[in-house]
């Protein structure tokens, strides 16, 4: 096992220049032209299949790099956190992003690596041994979801990609993430130390959150990925009692269980979240772990970490206790090299929120379950599933009345169906189906929330012009709140 020269003989600049260097805008284009020129008039050139495969791979690599540049350009130019930390770049002037954003990622990674190298130099022999283990470890990357993302090929899309394709699904990306770090064009993964065993995954939650019943695991990284030591937006490590493997630490250690809850950040305060590219990530993880171990007053924990024979599972327990590693791949992952592991059953509501048609069909086998499913669809504003259920089952006005009487569905307990059909964010196509098929009365007044209002009141409040126009054409009137 070998430690990089950067750690053996540390000689790092005190300040990493974060100003983007200039690149030749034609460099990659010329290289691409040179590599794909072989396919010109291929019918007469007698070119080999191996050569054609090489040309195709070159084009794929170029496109993958171009997509990554777009994702990083968006993140570094739009994220307000990067602007406040003087780590931002200018937005591209044209429609296309240059590879300058990828160069910027490398510079930002070197900046954070420089910070932690200076903080931890020099290393003891125990520290060097632990660092060598981490650097030479294989990683698994885990994406959890209630959606069915694979058949023979695993396809995971970023929130931005999903939105651009008008796909309706439950999201874990919030407005604060988009505004402050703008990393909504990346796919997210938890990170584990590989133990090369069949027992996967080692962890089932990330940052205390169970993101889904299906774990999709890959063992290969991306040349354009980046890693953060925590959730990129929420960089606070939770108290030990929220950790998935809390008993392991509570049973074996004392002081460290009170030390772990903290913000993980760089030199510019708690919003300064260290970022490492794929090449630097193992070194960054190792040095930050060593920095934490040095500060710990728990001698037993320190001895456990520096055990020369530490096994991969124990190392993973430590790293995902001290940190909550998060890996990000630009835009989309598509691979046939993966494992899918079902961790638990998926509830009907979770399957609906994830647009998991396979699970929905397995669970909704009769009209009674269809009532539940339709209520969940309306409550979660899942128009795609609502319309699917309406097309599959012959719903009547009596079905809607029975649905409203269900005691074990919170949406029907709290709201009238008419309210759910017309609330802010509801899809007017679903409302249109209900009215056109006589399932609800256009002017029925709400009996539960906003008692006395009608669907037109809701549409007026949300300023949904399509819904307003449709309701008015069908004779809708306002409820008593707006009567003069």
Curated annotation (Swiss-Prot):
At which residues are the ANK repeats? 369-398, 413-444, 451-480
The answer on whether this UniProt entry bears the keyword Repeat reads yes
Q: Where in the cell is it found?
A: Secreted; Host cytoplasm
**Impact reported for residue 349 to A:** Strongly reduced interaction with host CASP4/CASP11 and subsequent ADP-riboxanation of CASP4/CASP11
Activity control, as annotated, is: Interaction with host calmodulin (CALM1, CALM2 and/or CALM3) is required to mediate arginine ADP-riboxanation of host caspases.
Q: What is the effect of changing residue 211 to A?
A: Abolished arginine ADP-riboxanase activity
Q: What highest taxon heads this organism's lineage?
A: Bacteria
Look up the EC number in the record and give it: 4.3.99.-
Major localization class: secreted
Catalytic site positions: 326
Q: Name one GO cellular component term.
A: extracellular region
| Outcome, altering residue 283 to A | Abolished interaction with host calmodulin
Q: What is the effect of changing residue 117 to A?
A: Abolished interaction with host calmodulin
Gene deleted: what happens?
A: Host cells display increased pyroptosis.
Recorded consequence of changing residue 96 to A: Abolished interaction with host calmodulin
Q: Which family does it belong to?
A: Belongs to the OspC family.
Subunit relationships: Interacts with host calmodulin (CALM1, CALM2 and/or CALM3); specifically interacts with the apo form of calmodulin, preventing calcium-binding.
Q: What does this protein do?
A: ADP-riboxanase effector that inhibits host cell pyroptosis. Acts by mediating arginine ADP-riboxanation of host CASP4/CASP11, blocking CASP4/CASP11 autoprocessing. This prevents CASP4 activation and ability to recognize and cleave GSDMD, thereby inhibiting LPS-induced pyroptosis. ADP-riboxanation takes place in two steps: OspC3 first catalyzes ADP-ribosylation of target Arg, and then initiates a deamination to remove one N-omega group.
Its recorded name reads: Arginine ADP-riboxanase OspC3
| Organism the protein comes from | Shigella flexneri
Q: Write the lineage as a comma-separated list.
A: Bacteria, Pseudomonadati, Pseudomonadota, Gammaproteobacteria, Enterobacterales
């Amino acid at each position: 096992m070998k430690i990089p020269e950067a750690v053996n003989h540390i000689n790092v600049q005190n300040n990493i220049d974060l100003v983007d260097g200039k690149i030749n805008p034609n460099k990659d284009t010329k290289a691409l032209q040179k590599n794909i020129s072989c396919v010109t008039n291929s019918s007469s050139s007698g070119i080999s299949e191996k050569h054609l495969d090489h040309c195709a791979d070159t084009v794929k690599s170029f496109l993958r790099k171009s997509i990554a540049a777009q994702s990083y350009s968006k993140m570094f130019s739009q994220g307000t956190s990067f602007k406040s930390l003087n780590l931002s770049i200018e937005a591209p002037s044209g429609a296309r992003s240059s590879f300058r954003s990828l160069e910027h990622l490398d510079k930002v990674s070197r900046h954070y690596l420089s910070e932690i190298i200076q903080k931890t130099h020099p290393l003891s022999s125990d520290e060097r041994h632990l660092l060598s283990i981490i650097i030479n470890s294989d990683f698994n990357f885990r994406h959890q979801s209630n959606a069915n993302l694979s058949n023979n090929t695993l396809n995971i899309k970023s929130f931005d990609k999903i939105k651009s394709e008008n796909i309706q699904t439950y999201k874990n990306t919030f407005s604060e993430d988009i505004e402050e770090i703008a990393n909504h064009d990346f796919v997210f993964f938890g990170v584990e130390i590989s133990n090369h065993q069949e027992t996967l995954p080692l962890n089932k939650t990330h940052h205390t959150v169970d993101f889904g019943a299906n774990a999709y695991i890959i063992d290969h990284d991306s040349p354009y990925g980046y890693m953060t030591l925590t959730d990129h937006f929420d960089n606070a490590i939770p108290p030990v009692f929220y950790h998935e493997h809390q008993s392991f630490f509570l049973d074996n250690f004392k002081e460290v269980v009170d030390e772990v809850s903290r913000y993980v950040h760089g030199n510019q305060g708690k919003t300064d979240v260290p970022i490492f590219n794929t090449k630097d990530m193992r070194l960054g993880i190792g040095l930050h772990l060593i920095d934490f171990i040095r500060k710990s007053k728990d001698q037993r924990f320190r001895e456990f970490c520096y055990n020369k024979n530490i096994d991969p599972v124990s190392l993973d327990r430590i790293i995902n206790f001290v940190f909550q590693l998060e890996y990000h791949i630009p835009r989309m992952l598509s691979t046939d090299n993966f494992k899918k592991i079902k961790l638990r059953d998926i509830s009907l509501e979770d399957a609906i929120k994830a647009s998991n048609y396979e699970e929905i069909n397995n669970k909704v086998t009769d009209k009674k379950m269809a009532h539940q499913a339709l209520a969940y669809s309306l409550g979660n504003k899942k128009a795609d599933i609502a319309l699917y259920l309406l097309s599959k089952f012959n719903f009547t006005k009596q079905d809607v009345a029975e649905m409203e009487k269900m005691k074990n569905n919170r949406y029907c307990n709290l709201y009238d169906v008419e309210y759910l059909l017309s609330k802010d964010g509801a899809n007017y196509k679903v409302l249109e189906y209900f009215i056109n098929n006589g399932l609800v009365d256009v002017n029925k007044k709400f009996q539960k929330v906003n008692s006395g209002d009608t669907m037109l009141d809701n549409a007026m409040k949300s300023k949904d012009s399509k819904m307003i126009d449709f309701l008015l054409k069908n004779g809708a009137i306002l409820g008593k709140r707006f009567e003069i």
